[in-house]
Amino acid sequence: MNLKQEKIAVLLGGTSAEREVSFNSGKAVLEALLKQGYNAHPIDPKEYNVANLKKDGFNRAFNILHGRGGEDGTMQGLLEQIGLPYTGCGVMASALTMDKMRTKMLWKAFGLPVADMKVVTRETFSELDPQAVVAKLGLPLMVKPSLEGSSVGLTKVKAVEELKSAVEYALKFDNTILIEEWLAGDELTVPVLDNQVLPAIRIVPEGEFYDYEAKYISDNTQYFCPAGLTPEREQELAILVKRAYDALGCRGWSRIDVMCDAKGNFRLVEVNTNPGMTSHSLFPKSAATVGISFEQLVVKILELSL
C-alpha cells in the first residue's frame, strides 16, 4: 500500500471549543506529510462538507480534530458511512472516551483504579448536599464537566462553601458534572502507539493543576520524560495503561492521563483519542525519547488508519 499515491485529507479546525488547538496540530501534521512527499490537503469541517471527501477524490483522512464533532464518534461515523479510512479510534471508543463519567464507570467495571467521584447533573443540582459530598470525598475537590476537553470548566474546590458555585460554573459547559477526590500525587500522561506503550511523561504545572493555560499557553509548565519512575513502576504503569486502552476498544493511537494519589497509587483519569500534535504537545515528546521523530510519528499514525 503506497500512501504517497493517495490523496489525504488532514481534518483540522472544526467547531469545538478546541478549534484553535486543532489548527495548530493540523498545521504541524500537514507540514510533516508535505515534507515527506505525501499528497495532503487541509480540510476544515466548518468550511467544507466532509461527506464530499470521497467524491472529491480523497482516499483517506488524518483526523486531527479535537473535542466535540471531531473526537466524539460523530466524524468517525460520517467517515465510516462514506467508506473513507481514517486515523485513530473508531466510533465507539471515540464516543465513549469523550464522556469522562462513562469512561470511568467502564474502567471501574474492569477492576481498574479510578478516583472516587460524585456525579451531578443539571436536573440533580438542586439536591446537591455539599456537606455530604465533602464528608465522602474530603477536601480539596476537583470539579469538571464530563464532556469538555482541554481542561475547560475545571475548578479546584478548597472549602465546602465553594462547591456549589464550582458546579454551577462547570454546568455552563456540560449537563453532567464530576466532583472528584483530589489526587495529590504526580500527574502523568502515557501515549500508546499501535498497541505499544510509549514512555510516560510527568507534568509539573506552575499553578495548582494542569489547566487550559498550562496546557497550551504557559512556558512554565515542566514536562519530564522519562518521568523519573523506577523501572518496576514504569512497567506497572504501562500494563495498567494498556489494559485501560484495550478496555475501551481504542486503536491506532491515544494518550491516557493518570494521576497518583497521596500514597502513590495510580488512578486512571481520561483518554485523548486525538492527542495534540503541536510544538508543546506531549505525544511527540514521548515518541522522541524512543527515537521516533515527529515526521516518523505522523507517518506511523497515518499507516495505522483503517
Swiss-Prot record:
Enzyme Commission code: 6.3.2.4
One GO process term, biological-process aspect: regulation of cell shape
GO cellular component terms given for this protein: cytosol
Cofactor: how bound: Binds 2 magnesium or manganese ions per subunit.
Pathway: Cell wall biogenesis; peptidoglycan biosynthesis
Residues binding Mg(2+) 1: 257, 270
Chain residues that bind Mg(2+) 2: 270, 272
Catalytic reaction equation(s): 2 D-alanine + ATP = D-alanyl-D-alanine + ADP + phosphate + H(+)
UniProt KW keywords: ATP-binding, Cell shape, Cell wall biogenesis/degradation, Cytoplasm, Ligase, Magnesium, Manganese, Metal-binding, Nucleotide-binding, Peptidoglycan synthesis
Locations listed in the record: Cytoplasm
ATP-grasp domain ranges (all copies): 104-303
GO MF annotations, alphabetized: ATP binding; D-alanine-D-alanine ligase activity; metal ion binding
Residue numbers binding ATP: 134-189
Pfam family membership, one: Dala_Dala_lig_N
Record keyword Hydrolase present: no
InterPro entries in UniProt: ATP-grasp, ATP_grasp_subdomain_1, D-Ala_lig_Van_CS, D_ala_D_ala, Dala_Dala_lig_C, Dala_Dala_lig_N, PreATP-grasp_dom_sf
Chief place where the protein resides: cytoplasm
Record family assignment: Belongs to the D-alanine--D-alanine ligase family.
Function: Cell wall formation.
Protein name: D-alanine--D-alanine ligase
Species of the source: Haemophilus influenzae (strain 86-028NP)
Gene of this entry: ddl
